[in-house]
A protein has these predicted regions:
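Hydrophobic alpha-helical and helix-loop surface patches within well-folded domains
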Residues: 50, 192, 222-462
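Beta-strand-rich binding/interaction modules
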Residues: 71-76, 427-428, 441-444, 448-512
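Short acidic/polar inter-strand loop motif in beta-rich domains
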Residues: 112-119, 513-524
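Extended, low-hydrophobicity, Ser/Thr/Pro/Gly-biased non-transmembrane segments
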Residues: 109-208
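A surface-exposed beta-strand-loop module
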Residues: 67-128, 186, 493-505
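Surface-exposed beta-strand/loop patches in extracellular or lumenal glycoproteins
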Residues: 49-69, 150-167, 413, 460-477, ...
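N-terminal, polar/Ser/Thr-rich
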Residues: 15-47, 71-73, 78, 130-134, ...
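Solvent-exposed alpha-helical segments and adjacent loops
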Residues: 527-693
Length: 693
C-alpha cells in the first residue's frame, strides 16, 4: 500500500503560491532535510528543528507545507532571521536579494501536536488508512508522509538525516539506514539517514526490542514490542528469502536495510525499506507467507521504481502479480489458476458499471471495486503480457524498467516500450484495450460440434463476445481419455469460428481452461460469496423483530465492515415481497416467520440454536455461521445470513467476515474461524461435454 497520495492532496492547496519555474522533481531541484525531533508522548506533541539545504533554484518566496496545528517559532536563512507567514498549513517565507543563490540553507524551528484517534481493530480493509495520519502517544508514535510533521516542499524528492530524541527505551524507525540508537540521561536518541531521494518520509516510534540479521549487503531488522520479540526469528529468515528471490528476478535490492516494524494499532503499510504491521497483524499465520513478501516486493516496485500517478498506478497490480500470484504459482499450477479465477470472480462481483474505470485512472484503492481493478485486473494484464511475449522477454523487460527507472517515475508507457523492445513486436493495441479502456470482455462458446471424418475427429464452433469486442487469442482445450490438446483461437470482432482436427475422440471442450484471460464471468460461474454482498448496490439488513434492538448495533457494524455502499436496517415485519427482488438481503438471525428466501445447499442445516455444516454439528454459544446464497426469489440477487448462537462473540466475528471475501460460508468458534468453503460451480457457457459412445 502506497503512502504517496496524501502528499498529493496537500500539494493541491499550494500551487498558486509557487514561483515561476516551481520547486519540483522535474526542475532538477535538490533538497536535503537535516531534521532534529524531540518527542513528548505524554503531551501528544513534538518539537522540531529542520535545516533544509536547497542546492538549485532562484526564487523570491518559498512555500512549504506543515501541519495546520503546528506553531512556527522562527525561520532563518543562512543563519539570519527572515519574515514568514504561517496560515492553514502553508508556511510562506519572504527571501531577500542575497538569499537568492545556491545553496540556500533554511532553518525552521517549530512544534506540533498529533493525536488522531486510532482503532482497536480493522473495521474494514478497503481503506486501510483509518484516517490516522499522525499520533504521538505513550502507546507509540506514527507520523506518515504528508501529515505535516516536518516542513515539506511540494513536488520535491528530498533526502533526509533524522535524529529523534524520546523518553528512555523509545526507539524511532523510518526509511533508510539506521545509524544507531543511544540512551543517555533518561533519553533515547535514534539516528537515520536516507541515501536516495524519496517522495516523503514516514516515522514510527515505540518501546521496541531490535533483532537484526545480515543477508549479504542488506541488514534486515525487526522492531517488535517485547511481547512479540519471539516472532523475530521467523520474520528475519522469511525476509531474507524474499530479498534473495527478488534480487534474482529483478535486480539488486535498492536500499541498505529493510525493517519490519510493529505498530500499536492495526495497520499493514509498506514504506521505502520498511513495513509497519499492527500487533494483531503480525500474529496472523498468513502474513509471513504472503503479505510480508508483497511489501518487500514494493521496495522494487513503487518505492524503488516510482509511480507516475498522472498516467495510472501500475505498481499495485505488478506487485500483486510478482508476490501473491507468484507464491501460488510456486506451490502448483492449480493454486495459481485458482488465484486467477478468484481475481475474475472479484472483478465480476465487485465492479458495477458505475464504479468501473480504466487502469490509466487508478491511483489507489479506496473500496472493494477499486481494489478489484487496480490490484486484480492489473495483475491479470501482466499475466497476459507474460503469456503473450514469453518468459524471457517478460522478465528481461522488467529488469530493463528497473534499471532505467530506479528512483524515477515510470508509467504504463515505460513498460510497453521495454516489453516491445524485448519481444520485437508492437503492443500498442494490447495496452490500448487493457490499460486505457475500462471493463473486460465477456465471451461464450457457441454451437460446439463434433464429427468423424475418415481417421480424424473434426471439432467446430464459435467464440462469441459482447460489444465492444476485444482482440483476443483465446486458449481452448480438448480433453480425451488418452490426453488433451491445447490450441489458440484468434478472436477479432464479436464472433470467430474455429475448426480443430484430432486423432482421438474428445469428451470435453473448454475455453480458457487455466483462467489466463481477463474477463467478466457469467452468473453460473460465480458461487455466491462474501464479495457478492460487498459488491451489491443496495442491501436490506433484516433483523427478527424480537431481537431488533439487541442486534441492531452488530448489524450496523457488519454492514460497515463489509463497506456496503447503500444499506437499510429494518425489522423482519417491514420486509415486503418486492424488496427481495429489488435488493440483496442480509439476515442477522434466522427469520421468525417462514423459511429464509434461499435454497439450502446440500450438507447445511440451520436451526435457531444450532447448525450443521458438512456433517459437523455446532451448538456452542460461541459458534457463529455466515453464509451467502443465491436468492430463491430472483436468481441475480443474493441472500446472506449471519447466525451467531449468542451475542458474546458476535461483534468480533462481524469484524472478521470482510477478510473472507472469496468464500460462500464461514463458521467461527470463540471468534476464530473453524471452517470455510465455496459452493460448487457446475455450469459454464465456456465448456461443453460430449457423452461417451
Amino acid at each position: 500500500m502506497s503512502r504517496r497520495m496524501l502528499s498529493t492532496l496537500f500539494l493541491c492547496g499550494a500551487i498558486g503560491l509557487w514561483p515561476a519555474g516551481g520547486l519540483s522533481a522535474e526542475s532538477g531541484l535538490s533538497v536535503h532535510h537535516d531534521l532534529m525531533l524531540v518527542l513528548h508522548p505524554s503531551e501528544n506533541k513534538l518539537s522540531g528543528l529542520d535545516t533544509i539545504t536547497i542546492e538549485q533554484g532562484k526564487f523570491s518566496t518559498l512555500t512549504l507545507l506543515l501541519s495546520k496545528g503546528a506553531t512556527v517559532h522562527d525561520v532563518t536563512v543562512s543563519g539570519k532571521s527572515r519574515a514568514f507567514v504561517f496560515k492553514d498549513g502553508q508556511l510562506l517565507i519572504l527571501l531577500q536579494n542575497n538569499d537568492r543563490k545556491a545553496p540556500l540553507i533554511l532553518s525552521i524551528r517549530y512544534s506540533a501536536s498529533f493525536h488522531d484517534p486510532v482503532p482497536d481493530t480493522f473495521a474494514s480493509t478497503d481503506n486501510p488508512g483509518h484516517g490516522v495520519a499522525g499520533i504521538i502517544s505513550t502507546q507509540g508514535t506514527f507520523l506518515q508522509a504528508g501529515a505535516g510533521w516536518y516542513p515539506e516542499i511540494p513536488g520535491s524528492r528530498p533526502t533526509f538525516h533524522l535524529l529523534v530524541e524520546a523518553p528512555a527505551g523509545t526507539l524511532a524507525v523510518t526509511s533508510g539506514r539506521c545509524l544507531g540508537h543511544q540512551t543517555k540521561n533518561g533519553r533515547t536518541s535514534s539516528e537515520w539517514a536516507t541515501q536516495f531521494p524519496s517522495e516523503g518520509l514516514s516515522m514510527s516510534a515505540g518501546p521496541y526490542t531490535v533483532r537484526e540479521k545480515n543477508f549479504e549487503s542488506v541488514t534486515v531488522a525487526t522492531y517488535f514490542f517485547p511481547e512479540s520479540a519471539s516472532l523475530s526469528h521467523d520474520y528475519l529468515n522469511a525476509a531474507g528469502r524474499y530479498l534473495a528471490l527478488y534480487q534474482e528476478l529483478i535486480g539488486p535490492y535498492p536500499f541498505q536495510q529493510f525493517s519490519i516494524v510493529e505498530n500499536f494499532f492495526p495497520t499493514g503499510y509498506g514504506f521505502p525499506s520498511y513495513t509497519l504491521l499492527g500487533s494483531t497483524v503480525i500474529r496472523l499465520p498468513f502474513i509471513i507467507e504472503t503479505s510480508l513478501g508483497h511489501e518487500i516486493a514494493h521496495c522494487w516496485w513503487g518505492n524503488g521504481v516510482l509511480v507516475d500517478y498522472s498516467h495510472g498506478n501500475w505498481c499495485e497490480g505488478l506487485t500483486t502479480y510478482l508476490a501473491d500470484h507468484l507464491y501460488k504459482e510456486r506451490i502448483s499450477d492449480e493454486e495459481a489458476r485458482q488465484y486467477r479465477l478468484q481475481i475474475l470472480r472479484n472483478f465480476t462481483t465487485l465492479v458495477n458499471p458505475g464504479d468501473d474505470f480504466p487502469l490509466s485512472q487508478f491511483r489507489g484503492r479506496y473500496d472493494p471495486a477499486s481494489q478489484a481493478i487496480g490490484y486484480g485486473k492489473s495483475a491479470m494484464v501482466f499475466h497476459m503480457l507474460r503469456i503473450g511475449i514469453g518468459e524471457q522477454a517478460f522478465w528481461e523487460g522488467l529488469k530493463d524498467v528497473f534499471r532505467a527507472k530506479l528512483f524515477k517515475e515510470a508509467s504504463w508507457k515505460d513498460f510497453q516500450i521495454a516489453f516491445e523492445a524485448r519481444a520485437g513486436v508492437s503492443l500498442e493495441s494490447f495496452f490500448e484495450q487493457w490499460v486505457f479502456r475500462k471493463g473486460a470482455p465477456q465471451f461464450s462458446l457457441k454451437n460446439p460440434a463434433m464429427k468423424k471424418q475418415q481417421a480424424s475427429w473434426i471439432i467446430t464452433g464459435s467464440i462469441v463476445q459482447k460489444e465492444p469486442p476485444y482482440d483476443l487469442d483465446l486458449p481452448i482445450r480438448m480433453s480425451a481419455a488418452s490426453g488433451r490438446r491445447d490450441s489458440k483461437i484468434p478472436v477479432r470482432g464479436t464472433e470467430a469460428t474455429f475448426q480443430v482436427s484430432l486423432q482421438v475422440r474428445p469428451s470435453r471442450l473448454v475455453v480458457d481452461p487455466e483462467c489466463d484471460v481477463m474477463r467478466i464471468l457469467y452468473p453460473s460461474e460465480i458461487p455466491p460469496s462474501v464479495n457478492s454482498l460487498k459488491g451489491s448496490s443496495s442491501v436490506l439488513v433484516v433483523l427478527p423483530k424480537a431481537s431488533f434492538s439487541k442486534r441492531k448495533q452488530v448489524a450496523g457494524f457488519l454492514a460497515g465492515s463489509l463497506s456496503l455502499k447503500k444499506f437499510r436496517i429494518i425489522p423482519e415485519d417491514e420486509l415486503k415481497a418486492g424488496d427481495v427482488k429489488e435488493n440483496d438481503v442480509l439476515l442477522v438471525g434466522l427469520p421468525e416467520n417462514g423459511s429464509p428466501p434461499f435454497k439450502m445447499p446440500e450438507g447445511l442445516t440451520l436451526q435457531r440454536h444450532r447448525f450443521k455444516v458438512n456433517e459437523r454439528d455446532y451448538d456452542r454459544p460461541s459458534d457463529s455461521f455466515f453464509g451467502v446464497f443465491r436468492s430463491s426469489v430472483h436468481e441475480e440477487r443474493v441472500v446472506a445470513l449471519f447466525q451467531p448462537l449468542s451475542e458474546k462473540h458476535a461483534d468480533e466475528v462481524a469484524r472478521k467476515i470482510t477478510h473472507y471475501g472469496s468464500y460462500s460460508y464461514l463458521v467461527f468458534r470463540e471468534g476464530r474461524n473453524e471452517a470455510k468453503g465455496t459452493w460448487p460451480v457446475t455450469e459454464s457457457p465456456l465448456f461443453h461435454e460430449w457423452e461417451e459412445e
